Amino acid sequence: MRLSRYFLPILREVPKEAEIVSHRLMLRAGMIRQESAGIYAWLPFGLRVLNKVCNIIREEQNRSGAIEMLMPTIQSADLWRESGRYDDYGKEMLRIKDRHEREMLFGPTNEEMITEIVRAYVKSYKALPLNLYHIQWKFRDEVRPRFGVYRSREFLMKDAYSFDLDAAGARHSYNKMFVAYLRTFARMGLKAIPMVADTGPIGGNLSHEFIILASTGESEVFCHGDYLEMAPPSADVNFDDAAGLQSVFDRWTELYAATSEKHDEAAFAAIPEASRMAARGIEVGHIFYFGTKYSEPFGAKVLGADGAEHTIHMGSYGIGPSRLVAAMIEASHDDNGIIWPDAVAPFQVGILNLKAGDSTTGAACEKLYAELTAAGYDVLYDDTEERAGAKFATADLIGLPWQILVGPKGLADGKVELKRRVDGSRELIAPGDILERLKA
């Protein structure tokens, strides 16, 4: 993509309304624009990141055996009355009426709807286990939306719902999602720590939050320092191996980890002092097992092998991709801007023409741009008339992981400069060697 033809509205000044780093940088980097309180437009640059985040989530959900679908954003109030949750959300839920005065709502979550769908079609134990997920925009009318997309009223959510014949099967489904979440966050360059969590209005008796450590996090967290050294499950993990998944779950939950709501001071004090970590963190995922909380009132049952009816056991599993983008920035930035993990960077490589209008640098940039694009790299070529200093600032602000600096002085010696955003390291390299260096 040529920057001269791209829509990237960079802000040089820090917006006054932005209170935290991610909000400031997302506005300055032209990723989002606020349209009303807690509601944002995702501009092209931001959408590229959001799409990459969603693609990783999809790949890991699919790998675990979950099946993607899409449910409507507008739901019937009758479904929520049937579950008994219609009043639980209070004013957070946006209630509306259609032209026929039928009561509807803008869904804040989908337990009721997915249960109603499964109730209608799944009649036999042979159709279980089943895990359905979708990625959908949701709305919760926060009293005080703030911090940009970190705590907004409209947000993108991946929510999955598992259905099993009994508690043992449901626990296997829970462990599948537990492992899938560990892999998802690791692929995004994040160290997510699972912590026992309160179930809140979702309900149930088993729940874990996945927390990444960040100084600006909203939660106070306490954990064993060894979590930072633990390796995520490998790509060849067998999701059908119940015992194997349970061992992964046990390994990731045997050490102490809790948010302030579930903190046990005595248990924390029992950790060797050198291994105790008290920090702040950001929730990036939340999973729940709630048994028959929704299937019971909806009458979601299947006929078992024994010929008897069995109420389906359920779980739900959420990741907020839009919030996750903000969380990644909170966890990975410096004074100059965003430092994207490679897997979600909107562009992998930036080419900076340091002398616009010069035929030699222009030709070298064009050649590099063509070669890298043909090799499958997402490239942003800064071919604008801006001065070199402004181009450096933009490249660092938007977090281009690799930056190729092309100027007449270096080209005279047959070299360009390759900069790594994450650590600022630079090296002189022949243009023809760039591809091999990026692959190294």
UniProtKB/Swiss-Prot annotation:
Its main location: cytoplasm. GO terms for molecular function: ATP binding; proline-tRNA ligase activity. GO terms for biological process: prolyl-tRNA aminoacylation. The keyword Ligase applies. It comes from the Bacteria. Coiled coil: none annotated. It is found in: Cytoplasm. Its EC number is 6.1.1.15. Keywords: Aminoacyl-tRNA synthetase, ATP-binding, Cytoplasm, Ligase, Nucleotide-binding, Protein biosynthesis. It catalyses: tRNA(Pro) + L-proline + ATP = L-prolyl-tRNA(Pro) + AMP + diphosphate. GO terms for cellular component: cytosol. Catalyzes the attachment of proline to tRNA(Pro) in a two-step reaction: proline is first activated by ATP to form Pro-AMP and then transferred to the acceptor end of tRNA(Pro). Belongs to the class-II aminoacyl-tRNA synthetase family. ProS type 2 subfamily. Homodimer. This is Proline--tRNA ligase. It comes from Xanthobacter autotrophicus (strain ATCC BAA-1158 / Py2). The lineage of its organism: Bacteria, Pseudomonadati, Pseudomonadota, Alphaproteobacteria, Hyphomicrobiales. The gene is proS.
